[in-house]
Swiss-Prot record:
Pfam families: Methyltransf_4 (PF02390)
Organism whose genome encodes this protein: Acidovorax sp. (strain JS42)
Protein's recorded name: tRNA (guanine-N(7)-)-methyltransferase
Binding site for S-adenosyl-L-methionine: E84, E109, D136, D159
Metabolic or biological pathway: tRNA modification; N(7)-methylguanine-tRNA biosynthesis
MF term (GO), any: tRNA (guanine(46)-N7)-methyltransferase activity
Amino acid sequence: MTQTLSSQDPQAPAAPPMPGAAGSAPADVAHPKGIKSYVRRAGRTTTGQAKALEELGPRYVLDYAPALLDATAAFGRSAPLVLEIGFGMGEATAHIARVRPQDNFLCCEVHEPGVGALLKRIGEQDIHNIRILQHDAVEVLEHMLAPGALDGVHIFFPDPWHKKRHNKRRLIQPPLVAQLAARLKPGGYIHCATDWQPYAEQMLEVLSAEPLLSNTAEGYAPQPDYRPLTKFENRGMRLGHGVWDLVFTRR
């Protein structure tokens, strides 16, 4: 994903760290205050993506503001609200929104080609239950979402930060998980997925340690029916790579 720009986006090579971005954060800065939910990536916005940004952005992209979001007004209806942090190029996001039309999906991603790609899918597939915030999800969580506002959270394939000295930059850390849990309604869920086993192990440890959350499985969960296998994921599986899903619910 993704915002933490995920391994769902293999077309976006890493750019040198930018001032203030996650890549330049000191290793000892506490998460999440010193670490954003994303890494800036290089990538060119295509003509089709730019057209979608221009034509559909005004309807589906929300402005960030440090004030609580009125989700009913933003979506034009009252429905269960799911937050997605980092959606890469939007392949899985669009699929899930189509198979779950009863839910609203608030999706955070800072990568402009990814935002344009999802908007293009929205137009082509006639999807109406997605709204996008092109902003750091940590700030969205802190300032725009009230406790108990969410029915679900999706974090699929966040940047694994493979090197041990970079592990503190990973998105799934206790302070962020505590914030997510507090913003879930009782019975709401957090669904994470990763294709990097050491990160899966960290996710399991951190999520299991949060007192407001309960694991729906003994360890890793079966892949829920709504989450599709993306082209990137299918390619990885053909190469023998594993994928780990974790689903925890709010007590």
